[in-house]
Structures are given as structure tokens and as C-alpha cells.
Amino acid sequence: MAPSSSSGLTFKLHPLVIVNISDHYTRVKTQLNPPASICASGHGSNNGEAMFQQNPRVYGCVIGVQRGRTVEIFNSFELLYDPSTQTLDRSFLEKKQELYKKVFPDFYILGWYSTGSDAEESDMHIHKALMDINESPVYVLLNPAINHTQKDLPVTIYESELHVIDGIPQLIFAHTSYTIETVEAERISVDHVAHLKPSDGGSAATQLAAHLTGIHSAIKMLNSRIRVLYQNLAAMQKGDKSCDNSVLRQVSSLLRRLPAMESERFQDNFLMEYNDKLLITYLAMITNCSSNMNEMVDKFNTAYDRNTRRGGRTAFM
């Protein structure tokens, strides 16, 4: 197990990076492991058994900004790296870096990413290869294996530290903590991806069940976190655990937000917005009914006028 980092840097990881890595891994795995229907039809069977890899590794760069002691990872892009020869396509990397610089001039290459359960010794080769771009790159590792018992994200961030082992200075990976940072656009995008409909469309009951299951899981996790927090506070009150002023301040800040929802001003604003929404819905229904009524009148006039002309009379409507 890698040791903990002692750099003191604060890392913030945006969900777009996790989505990009997951998408990269899924595409590569699908290409190397085509569906059974494709294999049976003969397409893709010429690649041989060597092409079927259960857990392929993917590689890419992570970009973002560093402000003082805070490193914020915003985005990522793929790399062309050959693990067998340990060669990195420099021209492709420089081209991608130039393109991203035109769109995001403030973003810099902060490190790289890969997939796997743990950092390997061979990962240090690509890590050292990026040190001419960033002297202290970070390594974001995503574990694609599904573990239903794990509650945390399967993402680990490593830093490289110089340690003296057997009298020889060597670079080793040291894992560091991080927090998930999101902006409004990312929250909307991630929520949209999480609620995408299946390819067959699915029934309304299936979509509702999936939505309610997601809400239930979120409430269940919130309840477990609150229970853990309550147990820690009870232990502090009894003296079984030393008081952590930082935790107490965060709990106090959280509790101060709750009475705001019961204030008279909040209720007035809520009722005002609620009535506005009802009024907009009512006006939309009236407009729709008026439009349908006009269409019906036009059709009736057209039909009546046609019948009266056949009889030699003129329509009065």
C-alpha cells in the first residue's frame, strides 16, 4: 500500500474527469471485447484471442489550475501510450495541449490518469515522462471493478515523493486525499447522464422505479452519515472521545442553515413562487384550449362552407 502524501496540497476533483475516464475505459473495453452477436457474425473475429482483454488499461492527461496550495482538476484528454514499449506519443500530446490552450488558456497539464486497482511500478515510467511538462505531476487512478460494499468513489490520487530506500533515492507514489468540486453546469450534466433512458425506451413504470430507487439510495446514505455524526457527537459529550473543534464548527454551521427554511420570509417567497407557477400553468392550459377551439372552428367553417356551396347557398359563419 502506498504511503500518505506529506506535501500539504489540497486537491479538488471535478466529476467531468471521472466521467471522461469512465467513458474512455468503456469505449476501449467495448472495442477489445465486442458483443457476442458481432463475434458470431464473423466481424471482429480475425483479431484473435489476444484482443479479448477483460480489464484493459487506458491512459490520459488531466488538466486544471493550481492556485497556491490548491490544485483543481477540471478536465482530461486521452494519451497515446504503448505499455509494451513504454513509449509516449509526444507529438499527439503536444497537439492536444495546444488545442486545449486555445480553448482554456488558464488550464495546464497537472498530471495523468489510468485505470486499475492499484498503482504499479511500471506506472512510474509514464509519470517520469511527464515531469518535463510538470515537475510534480499527479496521478489519478480509477478502479473500474464494481464493488457493491464500497461506499466511496473508486478514485485515488497519487503524488510522487523522493524517498531514500537502501541508500538509493527513489521516486514512489504517495496517495493523497481529495474532495469533489462541482459547478452548476456539471451538476446538470451529471444528473442528465444519470437519468438517461435505455436504448429500448423503457416503460414509464421502469423509469419511475429507477428514479425512486436513486432517491431512496441518496436518503439512505444521508441517514447513515447523520447517524455516524450523531454517534461521534454523543461520544464527545460523554467524554469517550476527544472534542474536535473543527467538526463542531462544521456541525454548528450546518445547523444554522435549518431555521432559515422555517422563517416567515422564506414561506412568503415560497408561496409567491408557487402561485406564480400555478398561474403560468393555468394560462398555458387556457392558451392550449383556445388554440384547439380555433382549430375546431376553422375546420367547421371549412366543412360548412363546402356543403353550402354544393347546395347553392352561401355560408353565414
Swiss-Prot record:
<comment type="subunit">
    <text>Component of the CSN complex, probably composed of CSN1, CSN2, CSN3, CSN4, CSN5 (CSN5A or CSN5B), CSN6 (CSN6A or CSN6B), CSN7 and CSN8. Interacts with itself. In the complex, it probably interacts directly with CSN4 and CSN5A or CSN5B. Interacts with CSN7 (via C-terminal tail). Binds to the translation initiation factors TIF3E1.</text>
</comment>
<dbReference type="GO" id="GO:0009585">
    <property type="term" value="P:red, far-red light phototransduction"/>
</dbReference>
<keyword id="KW-0539">Nucleus</keyword>
<dbReference type="InterPro" id="IPR037518">
    <property type="entry name" value="MPN"/>
</dbReference>
<dbReference type="InterPro" id="IPR000555">
    <property type="entry name" value="JAMM/MPN+_dom"/>
</dbReference>
<dbReference type="GO" id="GO:0030163">
    <property type="term" value="P:protein catabolic process"/>
</dbReference>
<dbReference type="GO" id="GO:0010387">
    <property type="term" value="P:COP9 signalosome assembly"/>
</dbReference>
<dbReference type="InterPro" id="IPR024969">
    <property type="entry name" value="EIF3F/CSN6-like_C"/>
</dbReference>
<comment type="function">
    <text>Component of the COP9 signalosome complex (CSN), a complex involved in various cellular and developmental processes such as photomorphogenesis and auxin and jasmonate responses. The CSN complex is an essential regulator of the ubiquitin (Ubl) conjugation pathway by mediating the deneddylation of the cullin subunits of SCF-type E3 ligase complexes, leading to decrease the Ubl ligase activity of SCF. It is involved in repression of photomorphogenesis in darkness by regulating the activity of COP1-containing Ubl ligase complexes.</text>
</comment>
<dbReference type="GO" id="GO:0005634">
    <property type="term" value="C:nucleus"/>
</dbReference>
<keyword id="KW-0736">Signalosome</keyword>
<keyword id="KW-0607">Phytochrome signaling pathway</keyword>
<comment type="similarity">
    <text>Belongs to the peptidase M67A family. CSN6 subfamily.</text>
</comment>
<keyword id="KW-0217">Developmental protein</keyword>
<dbReference type="GO" id="GO:0000338">
    <property type="term" value="P:protein deneddylation"/>
</dbReference>
<protein>
    <recommendedName>
        <fullName>COP9 signalosome complex subunit 6a</fullName>
    </recommendedName>
</protein>
<keyword id="KW-0963">Cytoplasm</keyword>
<feature type="domain" description="MPN">
    <location>
        <begin position="30"/>
        <end position="164"/>
    </location>
</feature>
<dbReference type="InterPro" id="IPR033859">
    <property type="entry name" value="MPN_CSN6"/>
</dbReference>
<dbReference type="GO" id="GO:0005737">
    <property type="term" value="C:cytoplasm"/>
</dbReference>
<dbReference type="Pfam" id="PF01398">
    <property type="entry name" value="JAB"/>
</dbReference>
<dbReference type="Pfam" id="PF13012">
    <property type="entry name" value="MitMem_reg"/>
</dbReference>
<dbReference type="GO" id="GO:0006511">
    <property type="term" value="P:ubiquitin-dependent protein catabolic process"/>
</dbReference>
<dbReference type="GO" id="GO:0008237">
    <property type="term" value="F:metallopeptidase activity"/>
</dbReference>
<dbReference type="GO" id="GO:0008180">
    <property type="term" value="C:COP9 signalosome"/>
</dbReference>
